[in-house]
Structure formats: C-alpha cells, structure tokens
Regions:
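Basic, alpha-helical nucleic-acid-binding regions used in initiation and control of genome expression
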Residues: 1-226
Length: 226
C-alpha cells in the first residue's frame, strides 16, 4: 500500500512543521514506511553520489512496510479503532500527549504573532516554557495566556515604546509571569476554544479520540496523567 507524497496532501498532519518532520523521520528510521521506487525523480537528489538513498522526505511516495494478514480488513480495523493504550505504557502515552500539547501551543503562539505582524522563531526556550506551563494549565487555558501576552506586546509596539523585534521578544517572559501569578493566586483561567484558522491536526484528533479515548479533554485538561 502506498502513501502519497506529503507535499501533495491537504491533510494537516501535526500542529507544527517541526513535529511533522520528526514524525516522518521516526517512521523512516523504524522502517514503518519505505521509499517507493515509483517515486518521482525530482523527489531525489539526483546529483548526489548517494542517489537514490538521498531524498526529499515530503516529495517521495512511501510504501507501508507492514505484514498484512490474509484478511486485510482486520488490520485496517485495528489501525482505525486501536486498543494501543494500556497502563504499562502510561508514561509513553503521557509523553506523546505533552509533545502534541506543546506543538499546539507553539502553533497558536506563532499564529497570533503573525497576525499582529511580528516575526518570531520558536526555539528551545519556547518549547521548555510551554512544557512547564502544561504542568498546571491546559492548552485551552494557555491559548488565553498567549492571547494576553501578544496583545500586551502589540500595545507596547503601537505606543512606540518598543520596536517590533523587542516587543515580540517580551511575549515568552509575559506568558511565564502571567502563568505564575495565576498559579500563585489560584485564578481560574478562561478556557479558549480552538479557532477555525487552526483546525485540529490529524495526529491530535486520532491520538485523543481514538488512542487515549479522551476526546476534547486532550485540549481542555492539563497533560498530567492518563
């Protein structure tokens, strides 16, 4: 069975480009998917001495490297309606929940900053900050923290107190400070909804609704236990 090139798909696979790349690299490294010989030539670096082993991961066609039972319908049924989760895998399950949650926070942060014309490159500091916030707050609550921090940064710029870069760089610190105040004072932060411009990714939906079977709680509850 073939998997079409990612660049030809309209599917939002994960919340961020970094997580999508990580997902593909893991599937390739574990040989769950392998490059199809029917992939288009421009999917490879044809001038490389390692051709055809050097390729563009989003341009090639893949083959599912799975052992198919006689009744393939059973396999597809298992994939679409999985029973993967068990208490012995709770730590791994929680770790993936956190990764998806951090990615959704980064996605919303970058969206809000772009909306007000700020340029910002999320890095390790941003990732770690959201990891810490998720110990106490859900993604839906962190949406609100982000919205407030970006609004405050935009105000600083519009009042000509900071330039765009300086204003954008205040956002991470503002998120941290507001979250700490909320925690120390026991504030019940408002839970925001997902927005139409950022629909839930396929990975997020499948993991929360099919694997963990917690539905929207993956968005509205902090990822502290499964």
């Amino acid at each position: 069975y073939e998997v079409a090139p990612h660049q030809d798909s309209n599917v939002i696979l994960t919340p961020t480009a970094a997580l999508t790349k990580n997902l593909y690299n893991n599937l390739i490294d574990e040989r769950i998917i392998t490059v199809s010989p029917q992939s288009p030539l421009n999917a490879f670096k044809i001038d490389s001495k390692d051709f055809p082993n050097v390729f563009y991961i989003y341009k090639v066609t893949y083959l599912l490297n799975l052992s198919f039972p006689d009744n393939k319908q059973d396999l597809f049924e298992k994939i679409l309606n999985p029973c993967y989760y068990s208490s012995e895998h709770a730590n791994e399950a929680l770790e993936l929940w956190k990764k998806i949650a951090v990615a959704e926070c980064i996605e919303y942060l970058e969206y809000q900053l772009t909306k007000v014309g700020f340029q910002f490159a999320s890095g390790d500091k941003t990732y770690k900050m959201f990891e810490i916030l998720l110990n106490d707050f859900s993604v839906s609550q962190i949406y609100g923290i982000i919205w407030k921090a970006v609004a405050d940064a935009s105000k600083l710029y519009l009042e000509k107190r900071f330039n765009k870069n300086h204003a954008a760089n205040t956002v991470i610190g503002a998120c941290t400070r507001y979250a700490e105040r909320a925690k120390d004072n026991g504030w019940n932060l408002t839970s925001y909804n997902r927005i139409k411009d950022l629909p839930q990714s396929t990975l997020s939906w499948f993991y929360f609704y099919r694997v963990l079977d917690i539905g929207n709680m993956g968005f509205t509850v902090p990822p502290t236990s499964v």
